[in-house]
Structures are given as C-alpha cells and as structure tokens.
C-alpha cells in the first residue's frame, strides 16, 4: 500500500504555510470524526487523524511524514505534526472502515479547507461513489423525539426513519417503559445505523432520561448524533414531505401521525438536506413498520446467537456485501455466524433481504408456513433450484444500485445492464412454467409458487417489452456485443451518423497502418504487434521490450513511452489520424450525451417495475439459499412442526444441533434433545462443567427457534416449535468494562430489560447470571430472578448456572426442570506420555443435577500432581458432608429455632458424658483399650436415645431417628 502512496505537493512555500494555517483555524473536531483534504488525484489526512489512518489502514506508522510548519503556525498547531496521503483506491477502504465498521463520521474539504462533503454511518450518499462497493444491508437513519410521562414512568417516542438507498421514509410512535425495550427492538429490527436525538443538556431531569435512551442506542451499535431541540419542530414538515413523496398524501399525515413523529421527521429531513438536491424530490415512498409483526430481539440476542460476523470494533457485523461464492464463510473461509451459514445468495438484493429477515423473524404462523412450503418445494425440485442458482440468479444485477446511479451520473452501460436484466425475466418465467406444467396443477404448493413468484414476474413481462423495444431502437447492441462499446445507433440521429461514418473511415486507416507496420517490422499483427487505444496517447502500437530493438532500425517510428508491458510507439501519419479520431470522438460523445440522458430518463420511469421484480427475485434467492443450506448440511435439516402463540406451548427437539458449530472442522459435536412444555417443564436449569457445553445447549435452542421463524428448516431429526414473540438473552458482559460499566451493572440493566420485555410467549436465555458480584449476592440475585421468571412470567426459559443450589427451585415450582451436562472423557491409553490431544470432551445434556466432581476427574486425567488431587478430593468430601447435613435438615423441615434449642440439649448431654469419663480416668488414650472406648461411646448414644422428649421436640426426634 505504501509503495503507491502519492506525495503531498505545494506550488510554493507560501501555499504550504497557508494550507496549515487554515487547518488550525477550523472549528473543534467532533469525537469519532475523520477529516480529509481532497488534493485532486489523492487525499491528505493531518494530525491525530493521520496516525489513526496509519494504524488502521496501513498498519504501520512508517507512512507518516512531518508537516513543514513555520514558527507562528506551529504554536497554534495542537495536533501531532504528521500527515499521510491516501490514494483513491485506499480512500474506498478508509471510508468503508470509518463509516460502516467503526461508526465514525467523515468530513472532506477542498484545498482551501472548505467543507465539500460529509458523511455519517446513516448518511453515506455524498461519498457513495467514492466507496465503490456494495452494501449488504439498507443504510437506515432514524430520529427520535421523546415525551416522558412523570406519573407512570412510561414515555412516548416519536420515531421517523429514512432509507436513502431505497428512497423510503416512515414514522411511528413507540410507547415504552423505563428501560426502553421497545426502542431497542425497533433499532434491531431495522438495523438502524445512526440516531438523531435531542440535546437536552440544559434540562438536568430530561437529560438524565435521555442519557438512558442514548445508552440503549449505543448498545444496539448505532451512532448517536445530538441536534438542537428546535430542529425537532413539526412546523411545515407536511410541505417538505409533499415534495419528497411527490403527491398530496403528506397533507393528511398530521391526522395519521403524532406531532412527536412529525417533529422527528422534520429533524431528519433537515439533517440529510434531502430537499437541497433535485433528484430526491418525488422519489420517496411512505412505508409502515409494525413492531408486533416480528419477533423481538435485544442487542444481547444478536450477539449471543451469532447472527452476524463479529469483529473487535463491530459486534453487530460488517455491512460489506458478501455474495455467495466469495464469502459464505467470509474472507477467512470459516463459518462463524448464522448469516454466513445461510448466505448462499447469488444476488446483492438477496443478501440484503437475508440480512433483513434475520433481524425480523416472523410471528404469524401462516406466513412462516408459506416460507417453509417454498423451501420444501425447492428442496424437492433439485433441477429447478440448480438452474436458478447457477444460470439465472447470478446474472441479476443490483437494480437498486443501478437506478440510483442512473439518477445521478448514469450512462449507456448502466442502461444495458438493466436491459439484460429485463430480458432474463421471460426466461425465468418460462423455466417456472415448464416445471409447474409437469406437476399436478392443483397441488397447494404449486399455487403458492404461482402467486409468490410466477405471477409477479409474468405480470411485468408485457410492460418491459416496451422498454426493451426502446433500447433496441436507440442503442447499437452490435457495437456492444462485438467491441464492448456503448453507442447510440447512427440511424437514430442524422448528425451522429455523419460523425460515425468519419470515425469508421479513420479507424479503417488506423487498422491499415497497423498491418503495414507489422509487415515492415516483421511481426505477427495478431500476436506480436498490438494495436491499442491508450488513455494518454490515443491509438498507437505496442511491442514487448525484447522485440522493441527492431524499432531502432526504422526512423519513421516514434517511441511514446516505456512501461513493464512494453514500448508504445507510433508514426507521424498514425499520430495525425489518432488526434483527428480523438477530436471526432469527443464531438460524437457530446452529440450523443443529450440522447443518452433522454434514454436514461425514459429508463428511470420503469424504476418501480424494476424494483418490484428485484424484490421478487431477492425473495426467490433467499428461499433457494435456505433450500441449499438445508440440503447440504452435514446432516440435512428438517421442516419443523409449528405451534402458534396462545395455543399449545410446546417445543420438542430431537437430536438438535448448533448449525454453526457443527460446521467447524475441529469440533466433534453431539446432538441433544430439548423439551420445553408450558406448566410441565418450561423453565430448564442447566448445570455442569464450565467448559462450553451449557452455553452451546441454551444458545442452540434460540438459534433453532429463530431459524424456524425466518422460514428456514432446522438442524434436528424431529422438531416441534412453539412460536415465540421475543428471544431475550443475558449471556455475558462483552466489552462493557471498556465503557466504564461494571459487569454487575450490565447484568442488572440487561436483566431488568428482559423482565420488562418478556411475555408468556417469549424465550429467555440466561448464561451464568450473578458472576459479576460476590457469591452470596450472585446466588441471591440468580434465585430471585429465576423464581420470578418461572412463577410470574411463565415463558420458556433456559438458565445455565454454576450455582448448583439453584436446582432446589425445582422442589418449589413444578414447571422447573433440572438438566445437566454429562462430560464424557476419552483418553488415548496407548500413549504413555500425556498429550493435550489425548482428551476429547463430548457433551450430552440429560435430566438431573450435575456431578460436581467433574473438575477433579479432569485433573486426574491430565496428570495433575497426586498430592493436589488428594487434597481436592478431601476438601470436596468435607463440603459434600456439610451440604448433605444441610439438605437433611431441610428435608426434616426443622426451623432454625428448633435446631438451636436441640443443640443446647445435646451439648448438655455431651458435657455430662465427658465429666463421667474424666472421673473414671478414661480420658487418657494410653489408659483405655479400644474395646472400653467403644463401650463408652455406646453409653453416650444410649443416653441420647433415652433422653425424654418435650412437646414438639422435632430436633431430638430427628437425631434419634438417625441413631436407629
């Protein structure tokens, strides 16, 4: 990278000094913002930003250069006096890293330090072309206006959101509680990248609540942008929306939406400056988002279930597009997330839709079953699926990106890509038709295929024929197919025809010169002597450097430049013709540009049709991807039987597997059964060795439920699954310590959110709750929360814990069931010397409570020192005896007062017995035989047994029973 870096250049010393002087006069830079200067062919970054770029992009500080500052400027220069230059190619990497991976904002200035472009994670429009890459999810930015109710502690959040990549705008009101769990679900479902909120620092009470809102936004991986409260006024917003939507519908919006959401929308329109660009006007569509239509997922669930590839800075995954064939497992070739596992999509739109489905699992059983029916159909129709995924879907372009490009700086090449897309629609229709004709037309699944895929595709074939006719009439398709040239047909415009005729004549002359030169120099014109249209020299010829010595023998050849590929040269006649050709070509392009713009404008009128077709094909692509994944898993996935909400609450999984873990080459995975049934065992407490088995077990239940509700088959032998309205997780502190939040505080905050958010139809996953504080406090917290979930909420819950005492909850509540991880250890007995690879831990989850001696067993296997193992066994036995005694007392149902009073009476008996032993001189071991000592102990036991009992003397009764 550093070898291609350009140098920072100035015309003179004065320009250089002025450059740095203006830099020192810029306003203070906001946090997490990078500033760049556009120097034309390259970009420059200065100060701490330069160090950031050196470390993050170049991965070395050797690329840094010293700024040349005069003494006066140096005094005002409060940054490291370093700079680094960035080429156009590296710029794309830098922008992607800042905006999509790290959540930074970017400001780009011209040479005079005037701001010309700015971008943020939710608004990349101004730098989209510079990034030059596909994005695997929509770039959605939201705005929030909050109104708190001091009486009940709840609040109403007016929300507006805009997807600038898809030209969509929406509004809604969210009624939320004090932990803002509904807001969290909204941010997760839409994958919001940036949130605009009110700056309420002047109001201490409201600011404290707003800080809680900001913490929730931050937890969801969103960038927070503070705006003045005045920006959230709803004044005149309906007029702005009328311009954006292109109709009068917006005038009725105040009757449909609250002042809060309208005010939030006003802030959003102003922040994005949507009305400042003419190409935005009339392009937007008003959409609705209903939270209850989708399963709720909290931020912890996204990470705990490994839905997306996670990086050190980006726990919610990268936005860089990954189409199957280049990534399913990402760049490393290893599947680490559900997204990578399921991503066998062939289209960019399909990848985006898969990303959306993973964040928005369905809760309507009929809609889920439709997806399952379609997956089933494509699994059975192997030939159809292979034709679609190998011949047709890979040829589908990114329509959203193309139409957006046509709106700005599109060209004939983009029009032809859409034309090719249009031509493929009838072919796909024909493929479906032929397969459906071979099957029984009355089968329900065939009707579903017709309604979901075939009918929408067929419906638009006729309108698109007019578009295709327009392209075929105006564009020279022969020139494109033969020479990859994008030209208007000469017969379509008389003036263009004349110029084209002259160009053809000149090109014939150029080819003639090429052939004559080949004969003169003695080289084959097809293999040795190349004719090229060079970006600097125009039409010229090229020879390899080894063959170029022949040129020196002929004076008429003029050398132009020497590169690694060879030597470019020309003749006086060829240079003249090349110059004339260049002039005519520019005139042709100028004449053609007006016609091209007209063709583009006509093409854009078909945008709604193209986008609808793209969505249909994206849906087909994702379903085909599910079918592929289900068919080619190590053990094929099966279709689950679903139970709707508010009906039979039963989830029963036979031989379930974690879909991501079973794909790892270095893991031997054991399948497990899972049964969750309302009232009989809907709360599972899982104990066992702290080596991964418990965590995997509870998470795979969540992953399988989510897979079923997005429409995919599941990794089981048999599966009954109750649809859940939420998956809520508390599985670890993550990087919270880096943000100044203690592990215990994170546990409290996340658990509070779960308790507020969960309903009887939810699935709660808790892993090792209570580790962030002392053992006693942690156990108390875990017990109280577990008891509340099991007795008050009554939803499905999986509770993995290291507190074995928690298993006693099953004696109190009938719906609590204990499970434990059995760790089977295999050791290679042939090897006399221990090796780490000798041990294989295989986890199986079975009913009951875990054997707590597992750790000592492992210590013996790995040849721990014998002395330490014996000490550990002795200590464990002491603790077991103590625990057994305590458990026996609990079973006897003795109160603490009864135990204390009974102990006083026993002590009195013991003192009397000791007094008699001393009187008889038997307290000295050297003066008493073993037989005599046994006789004295029996006397003590008889004394206890004959002690008269008082009324309700339960403790003495208990002791006497033990002596029988």
From Swiss-Prot:
<feature type="region of interest" description="Interaction with MSH6">
    <location>
        <begin position="851"/>
        <end position="964"/>
    </location>
</feature>
<dbReference type="GO" id="GO:0043111">
    <property type="term" value="P:replication fork arrest"/>
</dbReference>
<dbReference type="InterPro" id="IPR027417">
    <property type="entry name" value="P-loop_NTPase"/>
</dbReference>
<dbReference type="GO" id="GO:0000710">
    <property type="term" value="P:meiotic mismatch repair"/>
</dbReference>
<keyword id="KW-0234">DNA repair</keyword>
<dbReference type="InterPro" id="IPR007696">
    <property type="entry name" value="DNA_mismatch_repair_MutS_core"/>
</dbReference>
<dbReference type="InterPro" id="IPR045076">
    <property type="entry name" value="MutS"/>
</dbReference>
<dbReference type="InterPro" id="IPR007861">
    <property type="entry name" value="DNA_mismatch_repair_MutS_clamp"/>
</dbReference>
<comment type="similarity">
    <text>Belongs to the DNA mismatch repair MutS family.</text>
</comment>
<dbReference type="GO" id="GO:0032302">
    <property type="term" value="C:MutSbeta complex"/>
</dbReference>
<dbReference type="GO" id="GO:0016887">
    <property type="term" value="F:ATP hydrolysis activity"/>
</dbReference>
<dbReference type="InterPro" id="IPR011184">
    <property type="entry name" value="DNA_mismatch_repair_Msh2"/>
</dbReference>
<dbReference type="Pfam" id="PF01624">
    <property type="entry name" value="MutS_I"/>
</dbReference>
<dbReference type="GO" id="GO:0140664">
    <property type="term" value="F:ATP-dependent DNA damage sensor activity"/>
</dbReference>
<dbReference type="GO" id="GO:0030983">
    <property type="term" value="F:mismatched DNA binding"/>
</dbReference>
<dbReference type="GO" id="GO:0036297">
    <property type="term" value="P:interstrand cross-link repair"/>
</dbReference>
<dbReference type="Pfam" id="PF05188">
    <property type="entry name" value="MutS_II"/>
</dbReference>
<dbReference type="GO" id="GO:0005524">
    <property type="term" value="F:ATP binding"/>
</dbReference>
<feature type="binding site">
    <location>
        <begin position="688"/>
        <end position="695"/>
    </location>
    <ligand>
        <name>ATP</name>
    </ligand>
</feature>
<comment type="function">
    <text>Component of the post-replicative DNA mismatch repair system (MMR). Forms two different heterodimers: MutS alpha (MSH2-MSH6 heterodimer) and MutS beta (MSH2-MSH3 heterodimer), which bind to DNA mismatches thereby initiating DNA repair. MSH2 seems to act as a scaffold for the other MutS homologs that provide substrate-binding and substrate specificity. When bound, heterodimers bend the DNA helix and shield approximately 20 base pairs.</text>
</comment>
<dbReference type="InterPro" id="IPR036678">
    <property type="entry name" value="MutS_con_dom_sf"/>
</dbReference>
<keyword id="KW-0547">Nucleotide-binding</keyword>
<dbReference type="GO" id="GO:0032301">
    <property type="term" value="C:MutSalpha complex"/>
</dbReference>
<dbReference type="GO" id="GO:0005634">
    <property type="term" value="C:nucleus"/>
</dbReference>
<comment type="subunit">
    <text>Heterodimer consisting of MSH2-MSH6 (MutS alpha) or MSH2-MSH3 (MutS beta). Both heterodimers form a ternary complex with MutL alpha (MLH1-PMS1). MutS beta also forms a ternary complex with MutL beta (MLH1-MLH3), and possibly with a MLH1-MLH2 heterodimer. Both heterodimers interact with proliferating cell nuclear antigen (PCNA/POL30). This interaction is disrupted upon binding of the MutS heterodimers to mismatch DNA. Interacts with SAW1.</text>
</comment>
<dbReference type="GO" id="GO:0000228">
    <property type="term" value="C:nuclear chromosome"/>
</dbReference>
<dbReference type="GO" id="GO:0006311">
    <property type="term" value="P:meiotic gene conversion"/>
</dbReference>
<dbReference type="InterPro" id="IPR000432">
    <property type="entry name" value="DNA_mismatch_repair_MutS_C"/>
</dbReference>
<dbReference type="Pfam" id="PF05192">
    <property type="entry name" value="MutS_III"/>
</dbReference>
<dbReference type="InterPro" id="IPR007860">
    <property type="entry name" value="DNA_mmatch_repair_MutS_con_dom"/>
</dbReference>
<keyword id="KW-0539">Nucleus</keyword>
<dbReference type="InterPro" id="IPR016151">
    <property type="entry name" value="DNA_mismatch_repair_MutS_N"/>
</dbReference>
<dbReference type="Pfam" id="PF05190">
    <property type="entry name" value="MutS_IV"/>
</dbReference>
<dbReference type="InterPro" id="IPR036187">
    <property type="entry name" value="DNA_mismatch_repair_MutS_sf"/>
</dbReference>
<dbReference type="InterPro" id="IPR007695">
    <property type="entry name" value="DNA_mismatch_repair_MutS-lik_N"/>
</dbReference>
<keyword id="KW-0067">ATP-binding</keyword>
<dbReference type="InterPro" id="IPR032642">
    <property type="entry name" value="Msh2_ATP-bd"/>
</dbReference>
<dbReference type="GO" id="GO:0006298">
    <property type="term" value="P:mismatch repair"/>
</dbReference>
<dbReference type="GO" id="GO:0000400">
    <property type="term" value="F:four-way junction DNA binding"/>
</dbReference>
<dbReference type="GO" id="GO:0000735">
    <property type="term" value="P:removal of nonhomologous ends"/>
</dbReference>
<dbReference type="GO" id="GO:0006310">
    <property type="term" value="P:DNA recombination"/>
</dbReference>
<dbReference type="Pfam" id="PF00488">
    <property type="entry name" value="MutS_V"/>
</dbReference>
């Amino acid at each position: 990278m550093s070898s291609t870096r350009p140098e920072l250049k100035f015309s003179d010393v004065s320009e250089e000094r002025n450059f740095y002087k203006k830099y020192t006069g810029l306003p203070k830079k906001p946090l997490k913002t990078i500033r760049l200067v556009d120097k034309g062919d390259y970009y420059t970054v200065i100060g701490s930003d330069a160090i950031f770029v050196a470390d993050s992009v170049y991965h070395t500080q050797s690329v840094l250069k010293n700024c040349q500052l005069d003494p006066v400027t140096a005094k005002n220069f409060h940054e490291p006096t370093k700079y680094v230059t960035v080429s156009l190619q590296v710029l794309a990497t830098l922008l992607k890293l800042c905006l999509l991976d790290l959540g930074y904002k970017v400001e780009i200035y011209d040479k005079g330090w005037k701001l010309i472009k700015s971008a943020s994670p939710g608004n990349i429009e101004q730098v989209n072309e510079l990034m030059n890459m596909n994005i695997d999810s929509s770039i959605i930015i939201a705005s929030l206006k909050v109104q708190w109710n001091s009486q009940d502690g709840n609040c109403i959040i007016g929300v507006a959101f805009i997807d600038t990549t898809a030209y969509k705008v929406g509004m809604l009101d969210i009624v939320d509680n004090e932990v803002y769990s509904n807001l969290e679900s909204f941010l997760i479902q839409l994958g919001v990248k940036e949130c605009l909120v009110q700056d309420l620092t002047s109001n201490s009470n409201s600011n404290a609540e707003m800080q809680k809102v900001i913490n929730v936004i931050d937890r969801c991986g969103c960038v927070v942008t503070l705006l003045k409260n005045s920006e959230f006024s709803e004044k005149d917003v309906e007029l702005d929306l009328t311009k954006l939507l292109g109709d009068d519908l917006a005038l009725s919006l105040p009757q449909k939406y609250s002042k809060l959401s309208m005010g939030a929308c006003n802030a959003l329109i102003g922040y994005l400056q949507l009305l400042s660009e003419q190409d935005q006007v009339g392009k937007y569509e008003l959409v609705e988002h209903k939270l209850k239509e989708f399963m709720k997922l909290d931020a912890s669930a996204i990470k705990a279930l490994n839905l997306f590839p996670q990086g050190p800075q980006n726990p919610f995954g990268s936005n860089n597009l990954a189409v199957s064939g280049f990534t399913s497992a990402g760049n490393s070739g290893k599947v680490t997330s559900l997204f990578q596992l399921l991503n066998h999509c062939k289209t960019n739109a399909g990848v985006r839709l898969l990303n959306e489905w993973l964040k928005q699992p369905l809760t309507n059983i009929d809609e889920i079953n439709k997806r399952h029916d379609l997956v089933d159909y494509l699994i059975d129709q192997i030939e159809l699926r292979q034709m679609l995924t190998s011949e047709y879907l890979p040829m589908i372009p990114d329509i959203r990106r193309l139409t957006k490009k046509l709106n700005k700086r599109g060209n004939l090449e983009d029009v032809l890509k859409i034309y090719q897309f249009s031509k493929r629609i009838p072919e796909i229709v024909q493929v479906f038709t032929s397969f459906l004709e071979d099957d029984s037309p009355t089968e329900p699944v065939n009707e579903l295929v017709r309604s979901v895929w075939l009918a929408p595709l067929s419906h638009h074939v006729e309108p698109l024929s007019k578009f295709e006719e327009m392209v075929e009439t105006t564009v020279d398709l022969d020139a494109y197919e033969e020479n990859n040239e994008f030209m208007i047909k000469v017969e379509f415009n008389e003036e263009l025809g004349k110029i084209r005729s002259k160009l053809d004549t000149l090109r014939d002359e150029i080819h003639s010169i090429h052939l004559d030169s080949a004969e003169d120099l003695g080289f084959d014109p097809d293999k040795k002597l190349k004719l090229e249209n060079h970006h600097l020299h125009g039409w010229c010829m090229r020879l390899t450097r080894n063959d170029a010595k022949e040129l020196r023998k002929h004076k008429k050849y003029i050398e132009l430049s020497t590169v690694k590929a060879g030597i470019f040269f020309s003749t006086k006649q060829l240079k003249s013709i090349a110059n004339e050709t260049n002039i005519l070509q520019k005139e042709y392009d100028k004449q053609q540009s007006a016609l091209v713009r007209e063709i583009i404008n006509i093409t854009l009128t078909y945008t709604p049709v193209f986008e609808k077709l793209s969505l249909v094909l994206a849906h087909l692509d994702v379903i085909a991807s599910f079918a592929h994944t289900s068919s080619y898993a190590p053990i094929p996935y099966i279709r689950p039987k679903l139970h709707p909400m508010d009906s039979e609450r039963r989830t029963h999984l036979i031989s379930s597997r974690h879909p991501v873990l079973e794909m790892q080459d270095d893991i031997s995975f054991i399948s497990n059964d899972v049964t969750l049934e309302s009232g009989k065992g809907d709360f599972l407490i899982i104990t066992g060795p702290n080596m991964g088995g418990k965590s995997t077990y509870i998470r795979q239940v969540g992953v399988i439920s989510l897979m079923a509700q997005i429409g995919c088959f599941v990794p089981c032998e048999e599966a009954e699954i109750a649809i859940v309205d939420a998956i809520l997780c508390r599985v670890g502190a993550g990087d919270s310590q880096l943000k100044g939040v203690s592990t215990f505080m994170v546990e409290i905050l996340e658990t509070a959110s779960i308790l507020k958010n969960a309903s009887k139809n939810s699935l709660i996953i808790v892993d090792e709750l209570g580790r962030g504080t002392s053992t006693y406090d942690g156990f108390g917290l875990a017990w109280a929360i577990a008891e509340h979930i099991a007795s008050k909420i009554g939803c499905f819950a999986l509770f993995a814990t290291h507190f074995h005492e928690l298993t006693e909850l099953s004696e109190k509540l009938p719906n609590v069931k204990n499970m434990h991880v059995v760790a089977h250890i295999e050791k290679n007995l042939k090897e006399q010397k221990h090796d780490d690879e000798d041990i294989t831990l295989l986890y199986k989850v079975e009913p009951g409570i875990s054997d707590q001696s597992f750790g000592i067993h492992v210590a013996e296997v790995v040849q721990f020192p014998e002395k330490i193992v014996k000490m550990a066994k002795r200590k464990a036995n002491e603790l077991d005896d103590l625990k057994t005694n305590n458990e026996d007392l609990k079973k006897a149902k003795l109160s603490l007062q009864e135990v204390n009073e009974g102990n006083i009476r026993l002590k009195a008996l013991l003192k009397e017995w000791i007094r008699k032993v001393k009187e008889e001189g038997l307290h000295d071991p050297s003066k008493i035989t073993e037989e005599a000592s046994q006789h004295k102990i029996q006397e003590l036991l008889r004394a206890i047994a004959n002690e008269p009992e008082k009324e309700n003397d339960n403790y003495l009764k208990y002791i006497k029973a033990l002596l029988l």
